[in-house]
Amino acid sequence: MPEIAQAHTPMMRQYLETKARYPDAILFFRLGDFYEMFFEDALTASEALQITLTARSKGDDKVPMCGVPYHAARGYVARLLEKGFKVAICDQVEEPGKSQLVKREVTRVVTPGMVLDDQVLDPREASWLGAVALEGGRAGLALLDASTGQLQCGEVDGDERLVDELRRAGVRELVFSSAADGARTEAIARAVGAPAARRDAAEFERAEDRLRKHLGVPSLDGFGVSGLPLGLSAAAAALAYLADTQRAAPRHVDRISRLSTDDVLLLDEATRTNLELERTLSGGRKKGTLLALLDRTVTAPGGRRLAEWLRYPLADLARIGARLDAVEELSGASVAREELAGALRPVADLERLLSRLVLGQGNARDLRALAGALLALPALADVLEARGAALLREAGGRLRGLEALAAHLDAAVAEEPPATLREGGFIRRGHSAELDEIVAISEDGKGWIAGLEAKERERTGIGSLKVRFNKVFGYYLEVTKPNLHLVPKDWERRQTTVGGERFVTPELKGFEEKVLTAEERRAALEERLFEALRQAVAAEAPRVRTAADAVATADALLSLARVAAERGYVRPEVDASEALEIVDGRHPVVEAVLPDGPAAYVPNDVLVASRGAPECAEHGALLVITGPNMAGKSTVMRQAALVVLLAQMGAFVPARRARIGLVDRIFTRVGASDDLARGRSTFMVEMTETAAILHNATRRSLVVLDEIGRGTSTFDGVSIAWAVAEHLHDVTGCRTLFATHYHELQDLARERPAVRNLTVAVREVGDRVVFLRKLVQGGASRSYGIEVAKLAGLPAEVLARAREILKNLEAMEVDEGGHPALARGRRRRAGPAAAQLGLFGGGAAADPAADEVAKAIRALDLDALRPLDALNLLAGWKRSLE
C-alpha cells in the first residue's frame, strides 16, 4: 500500500488512511452509487470476483481500481466471503454537498464468521464463529452465532478433540490470541478448514468480569459456566470480535450456555461423514442426506434447530423421552399437525431480525417483518398450550409477553415500507403528530404547485408553461422559445436550454424554501423515530430470543412428527440397558430413494448387546458380517447407526420395533480415501480412524467397522482385522458390527463367546447371482466379486481370465517357485499345504498320509488324552508324514 502523501487527492488520502486501519480486509469505499477498491485490493478483488480492473490517473502513475454497484454489493461480498476474505464496508455518513469532502466511516467489517445479511446467510444453517483459548494441552472454545445471538463455551483436552468439536459445529471462522503459538494455531485452523484471525491477547483477559458486565449479572453461576476459565476467555474474545467488527454493542447476546459433551451422543468427524448426515459422500450435496429427509420444518429457525439436534443427539433419557412424547402426540394427530404448521407460517426469522436491528443493520422492512411475526405469536401459543406433551406446552408459554411490543411496532411501521430509510415514508400516519404535520406540508405542496401553474398560465397566456424540479436548480418555471416574449418582468431567469428558458418567481422561491426545509425535517424526524423503535426492540431482546427459541423447538418437533407419520416410523424404546434390538429396521434415506418406492426395501434385524449385558448371551456383542460385494452389508450397518442416532435425537425410527440401550458414542469406519493434503494413504487414513476408535470407545459405544485391513496385503489385513476384533470383544466389550471379506474372521465365533456370525443371503440362479439383501445367521463362503464385476460392465475377456485365475488360487496351483500360478503358459503343479493362502486352514490335503492324520486328529477325544499319549501320537504322525 502506498504512503499517504500530499500528492494524493483529499479523497484518496481519506481512502489510504481508512485502509491503513484495516490492512487484512478488502476495503469497499463508497463513492456515489459504487463501492470502489484501489491498489492491491483492486487487484485481489477483480481476480476473485472476475470484474473489470481499470486505473485512476495520479500524475504519471496509474492507480489500479475496480468497483461494484452499491445496490448489488451484497452478492459481491458473499462471493468474497466464500473465498475466505474479509470485507470492510466504508460508507458515506453525511449527504454529498454538505462539505468539500464527504465524511466516510467503516460501518462494519464482514468476515466469514461475522455475517448478518439475510441475503448472504443460508437461512437454514447456523453461522458459527469459533474462538479458542489455549493453555498447555487444554483448550477453551466458544461458539458464537452473531446472526442469532447464541453463545456457548466449554473446555476440552487435546487439540484433536478441539478440532472435532469445531468441525462438528461447522465453524466459519476462528479467533486466536496473538500470544498463542503460531504453528499450533495454524495447524488447528488447517485441520478445521476455516480462516483464522489473531486478536490482541487483552481480549482474552479479565473474561469473567467482562462477561458479567455485558450480561448485567453479579455472577455467571446461573448460566452453568463456572469453572471454565479458558472457555470464558474464549467467550469474551468472541464478544469483543463481534463488537469490533459490527461497530455496535451486541445487546442481543443476552445469555451464555455451557458447551458440554456429558449429556450428548458424541459423533466424530469420520462418523458424521460416513453416515452422510448433512452432506453426501459423493459430491458433498445436501440432497440425499439424513437432514434433507428429516427437514419438513416450516420456518428457518426450525430448520437450524433440527440440524443442531442432528449434530448433537442426546444422551439423557429424560430429555429424549420428552421429545419422543411430543413427536408421538403430533404424529398421531394430522389435524393438530396442520394447525401447528399454519400457526408457524406467519412467524418470520425472529432471531436474525432481532440481531440485525440490535446491531444497527436493520431497516424498516425488518421492523415490519418483526411486527408481523410478533403479532402471530399469541395464536401459535394457543395451539401449543392446547397440546398434552410437556415440551409443546412449555414452548407455548414462552411465546407470551410480547403483545405490547407487537402492537407498538404495528402501529408505527407502514404496511409496505421502502427498502432503505433514506427513501422515507415508512412511518404510519397517526404515530407522530409532528411527522404528520410535516408530511402534510410536502403533500399539500403538490396541490400548491398545480395551482401556481394554472394561475401563471392564465396570467401570462403561456399554455405550455410547466413547474418542474431538479436537484441542481430546485423548482422552476419552464417556458419554450416561442413563448419567451410573454414572460413577465418580475420573473428571474435561471437557465437557458436548447428548447427554451427556466425562471423563478419570489413566490416560487418562498415555497421551495418551505418544502425543502420540510423534507429535511421529515428525514431527520423519521430517523429519530426509527431509532426509538429500534431501541424498543433492543429493550425486549431477551423476551424475543426466548420466543424465537420456542418457535424453533416447536417447528423441529413438528418436522419429526411429519416424517414419522408419512413414512411409518415407530417410537423407539430408549432405556439404560446396553442392548440394541432393531426388528425390521430400514435405512431411512435408501428406502426413500428406491425407484420402486419404500415397499421394495428389504428390512433387517440387528440384535446385539455389550459383553456382559443380560441380552449378550442371546445376541452377542460383536457381529461378524460377511457376504458378497453389493449385497448390502454396509447399508445394514449404517442403518443400525442411524436408528440409534434418530432415537437419541428424540425422533421416531424406521423399524417395526426398536429398543436402544443408551449409547455414549457412535464410531463408524466405512470406506476411506487418500488424504493427499496431509500426505496420508487410504490405509493410513483407515488405521488412524481405527486407532481413534480403539482409544476412545467405551462399553456403551456403538462401533461400526467395514472392511478393516483391506488397504494392505492379505496376511497383514487379516491379522490387523482379527486383532482389532479381539480387542473390541475382550477389552472394550461394546456393541460392534464388523463387516469383512476376510472369511477367516468367522473362526472368531469358535474362540470368543460373544461373537456371532451373520451373512447377507444370496441366491444363485444359473450363472446369475441374486442379492436377497437379507441378514441371516451363519457365514459366507464366497464374495462373488467376479459377478459384481460383470454387473459393472468389465469386458468378457477380463472376466474369463479372472475366473481362470480364481480357479488356480482356489485349487492352490503353484509354479516351480512355489508361487500361485496366475500367468498363462506357466507350468503348474498342485501346491503343498505350506503354500495355501488361507491363514487358518482350508483347501485340499497334500497327500493320502496327511488325510489319514487329519482323520485321526478329528477322531480324538482330547478330554481323555493323557500328555504321554499325545506325545506318542505326535511321534507316529511325524513318521507317517516323513
UniProtKB/Swiss-Prot annotation:
PANTHER family membership: DNA MISMATCH REPAIR PROTEIN MSH1, MITOCHONDRIAL, DNA MISMATCH REPAIR PROTEIN MUTS FAMILY MEMBER
One Pfam family this sequence matches: MutS_II
SUPFAM superfamilies membership: DNA repair protein MutS, domain I, DNA repair protein MutS, domain II, DNA repair protein MutS, domain III, P-loop containing nucleoside triphosphate hydrolases
Identification of the protein by name: DNA mismatch repair protein MutS
Residues that hold ATP according to the record: G627, P628, N629, M630, A631, G632, K633, S634
Keywords of the record: ATP-binding, DNA damage, DNA repair, DNA-binding, Nucleotide-binding
Molecular function per GO: ATP binding; ATP-dependent DNA damage sensor activity; damaged DNA binding; mismatched DNA binding
Disulfide bonds: none
InterPro entries: DNA_mismatch_repair_MutS, DNA_mismatch_repair_MutS-lik_N, DNA_mismatch_repair_MutS/MSH, DNA_mismatch_repair_MutS_C, DNA_mismatch_repair_MutS_clamp, DNA_mismatch_repair_MutS_core, DNA_mismatch_repair_MutS_N, DNA_mismatch_repair_MutS_sf
Family: Belongs to the DNA mismatch repair MutS family.
Gene Ontology CC terms, in alphabetical order: cytosol
Annotated function: This protein is involved in the repair of mismatches in DNA. It is possible that it carries out the mismatch recognition step. This protein has a weak ATPase activity.
GO biological process, one term: mismatch repair
Coiled coil: none
Top-level taxon of origin: Bacteria
